[in-house]
């Protein structure tokens, strides 16, 4: 009996010890751009290396058990950033059939506390990533949908996102989404500024089309903290 109790106690201690070993990079402070504008660092000067994976459709395709399994494996593989699409389409649905939005961009009617609603499921993803020491790089809406989001809707959406996630430690904002930056510029600006107004706590960038860089269009924007370049993964004509 004593031996059994000892084994159980040892197992609990081992599990607890392993959980305590999860490295939380934001314990070094918020992310920011270094003084020489060459690197991402934390507030205390600790360098941050973006080891990211593109799990774009994570909010739509995986249920909660799968999210936990996937993000745990990502941590074990050494990833510290997951790049996801918040909205891939209008409307967007998750694995539970819950709707994220419609063309009105009135998100209040799609928040469902206590259910597996779209936004509650996204909250779960963000929190599960945090428990694994992983940042969520939120691409707010995929570039192909920009013609459905005017400046007014972009401002509403940005306010909604910024207020919802401004106190989460593991958020990186991505405007755009595999698109040329000269398309929908006014809407991208409105979205970015609304997020920044509601959430000054997290860094922001623009995700461009393959073989382009955000610097071509947004380098002078006050909301852009750092540029992104996409090498591309197909032919571009």
What function would you assign to each model-found segment?
Residues 1-4:
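Positively charged n-region of N-terminal signal peptides that target proteins for export
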Residues 8-9, 89:
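A periodicity- and composition-biased signal for non-globular, repetitive helical segments
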Residues 9-18:
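Hydrophobic h-region of N-terminal signal peptides that target proteins for export
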Residues 23-236:
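Active-site mouth of glycoside hydrolases
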